[in-house]
Amino acid sequence: MIVVLRKKEKGWITMGLFKDNFTLLKKASEPLYKTPKSVQQTIEIMKISECGIFEVASGKYSKTYRFSDVNYATRTENEQESFFQRYCKCLNSFDCTFKITVNNKNKDMELLKKDVMLSYEQDGFDKMRKSYNNIIEEKILEGRQGIEQERYITISIERKNFEEAKAQFTTIENSLFKNFAELGSKLIPISGNERLKILHDYYRLGKEEEFDFDIKEGKKTGTDFRNDICNSKLKFYQDYYEDESKVCRAIYIKKYPTYLSDRFFTELTFLPIHSITSVDVVPVPKDMTMRILQKKYLGIESNIIKQQQTRNKNNDFSSEISYTTRRQKADIEDIMNNVRENDESLFFVGVTMVVMAENIEELDSICESIDSVARGTGCSVDICQYKQREALNTVLPIGVRQIETMRTMLTQSLAVLMPFNVQEICDKSGIYYGVNQISKNIIVGNRKKLLNGNGFIFGVSGAGKSFQAKMEMG
């Protein structure tokens, strides 16, 4: 289990050393409409394109990619350490603002059952089919019902026009695909229609099948995409908001501990609730990082001299300095060494989460569960008071950030917010193979989709190898 410690080689969460934040870097973007007159005006998108590039503000463009989960939780500690270092390398490669999003989206369980269970043929064997279907249904109920997890990374850049932005995204993708391939994760650019569907599925939870907007057709007819993805009602309160089908609350991580387990982010996003969690990251240029670190170091040295002068005036000629100042000096020296020698980078990081429920009582209960998970690791979460709309826009994979609550982290501290957990297999028209031991979701595979569909069935005597082979043969 990888843990971030303040003075260990693996990195540490910087605690209050950068109170004079680089306001320009972490400044939140302004809403397109300060006072929206319609639900459509709450959607922070100016222009869309078929290739998936959205203009979210004047001269600011974003593009979203879906990336697959990999088996991280099942690895040995040494393998996790190696993967962790590769992920750090991936994070260091970013020189633009990005957002990592884990979306616990709605899943049609009836459709899953229909796809996996055997259909009745009334040929005298339906009793056996029913017994088999009962086993599958029992296993489905043990998993995370009604929830399917997807992961996205949204890149945001500033360019003069669409063509320049498109060229820049092409350049970014060259290294992005390579870095994710080294992690074993498949990165897929999301088209404009797919990005709109992700937003539609959030706004119209439970009505996912109603989405039928096409950007190419919309251009011909002059249809506003906002009308097709938004819901009919959106009302914001101090600490929650509601729409036509659900109540939601936006929260954020307010406080981090001195050390943090790499399982924390997984535990937070693995709760069996409909939620969207985003990690907003703003890289700080290396030259600016060293400049501010040196400035801090000189400031601490100056404080030490002043303390000594004050003591000398009081006829106290001890060379001891206060514990707080001594601690600050040691911390800043450790950070400077890591930035110089271990290729650490500095980032502004903010974690925001939107949770959904059918009523306010259920919402409060869910937030208590999240708070319990956070407190168990030494973190604390808080509600985005009077900022529910801004937090919602920040969480969604649009490419805007309207919340300024961020803190500084080094590369390895950021990497501890690990978005990878375990790979799921749920192929369409597949066969039930068992249960994922980590997620408890069923494994449904379709070997016909593989490049080579051959396989072996391993097991001890009596494990059911012959039965499994016969089930595949039908």
Task: Describe each PLM feature range.
Residues 2-6, 11-419:
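Extended, folded cores of ATP/NTP-driven motor/assembly subunits in large transport
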Residues 51-54, 70, 77, 84-91, ...:
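Glycine-rich phosphate-binding loop of nucleotide-binding enzymes
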Residues 406-435, 439:
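Pre-P-loop entry segment of helicase/translocase ATPase cores
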